[in-house]
Amino acid sequence: AGPIQWSVIHGDPETGVTTMLMAEGLDTGDMLLTLKTPIGEEETYGELHDRLMHIGAQALSQTVAGLADGTITPVKQDGRLATYAPMLDKKIAELDFTRPARELHNLIRGLSPWPVALTHLDGKLLKVHKAAVAEGYSGEPGTLLDSKRMIVACGEGALEFLTVQLEGAKRMDASVFLPGRRLEVGHRLG
């Protein structure tokens, strides 16, 4: 499962770490301590993962101290509020440009650094490691809207690809990638 990735993909505004007692079911034990943190609008799964690693260490330290001094009381979970993150499937990595730009931006962030969002350019696989929502653009979904910046139309709005990797090539900034490709406005991706 990929709970951190799904939080980013769904555009959740915050996430966190909870310590809990062990129980027979998966993540069903009584909760001990929860530390929440906002998810940045540009933050990737990898960046959030690394932040949560440190927050998790703090939570564990605070939990041990709280149990030792009696300031933490276990709280039963409400099973009706429980959510489970399904396993990630590489099939979700394919960018569907008929979807809104914000959704695709969240998908790209949630799949970076693995498994990485992708599309096709001239029959070759193009991985999209980083992107941003491009304001003030619209057009036929999947078409290039700017020949100097890699801005691609979506079902609602547009995305600017910032870091890409063409099949068989190294990862690079789109500003370095584009000049060697000579792509024209209207060029189709997907």
Summary of predicted features, one role per range:
Residues 1-84:
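Donor/substrate-binding cores of folate-linked one-carbon enzymes
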Residues 9, 23, 84-87, 118, ...:
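Short secondary-structure boundary/capping segments
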Residues 26, 31, 72, 84, ...:
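Short clusters of hydrophobic/aromatic residues that line enzyme substrate/ligand-binding pockets
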Residues 34-35, 45-48, 57, 86, ...:
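Alpha-helix boundary/capping detector
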Residues 55, 60, 77-83, 88-92, ...:
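Short gly/pro-enriched beta-turn/loop segments at secondary-structure junctions
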Residues 92, 97-190:
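An anion-binding loop in the catalytic cleft
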